[in-house]
Amino acid sequence: MYAQGYFAYDSKKSGGLTVSHLRFGHQPIKSTYYISKADFVACHNPSYVDKYEMVEDLKEGGSFLLNCPWSDEELEERLPGKMKKIIAEKNINFYTIDGIDIGKEIGLGGRINTVLQAAFFKIAGIIPEEDAKKYMKDAATKSYSKKGEKVVAMNHAAIDKGIESFHKVNVPEAWETAEDKTVDVPATGDRADVVEYVNTILKPVNAYQGNKLPVSAFSNHVDGTAPQGSAAYEKRGIAVDVP
């Protein structure tokens, strides 16, 4: 089995976006481009469903795993109409898992990577489940043994929970005709240069669409400078809990 990983991440000091492009195969992998036809996509933060295109690049019949605390009924209200429509039209296998709740239950708090990784191997079926479980537990033991048996046991529990705790959503037929009610509200303000920069460049970049910007979008910034004050327009709302 061969594997290839490419990780695209932003420059945020913490809480930034990371997109992992992973390929697996029985022959050497020499692809040098982002994945645009995926068999599996996972979203680890529920707030991302309103911020990024999550399922557009999934293949027909692919799998989508969403980490969220929502019930099937709540998904109806929480998911954008465009996402629901694509899930239904492409016959996507849609799964949810509450990784945050699992992390709190076993003592790992917001550290959910192990939980989601275990769910990935179970759903994707790249290697037999028992092999995946063994490899992950062996790796956890090697990585955390110096921190004590309790930490190792928590990570082993996270692996078991990730494999058994995801839920397959019964996608309603009505999602095929779901309407996209997303409204793009342009930035406003007293400084025209900041507003122009935010609407033309910052918002597409923050939506992970920067590679689609035309050269003309940068006509007012040919020297690479950006106006000060744009941080006031960037309230990401990615926190799991708000005090």
Can you name each region flagged by the protein language model?
Residues M1-V41:
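Anionic-ligand anchoring segments at beta-strand to alpha-helix junctions in alpha/beta enzyme folds, i.e.
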Residues V55-F94:
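ADP-ribose/adenylate-binding Rossmann-like module
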Residues A132, G148-P243:
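Ferredoxin-type iron-sulfur electron-transfer modules and their immediate structural context
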Residues P28-E60:
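Glycine-rich phosphate-binding loop
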Residues R78-S143:
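Short alpha-helices
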Residues C43, L65-L66, Q117:
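Redox-cofactor binding/interface segments in oxidoreductases and associated redox assembly factors
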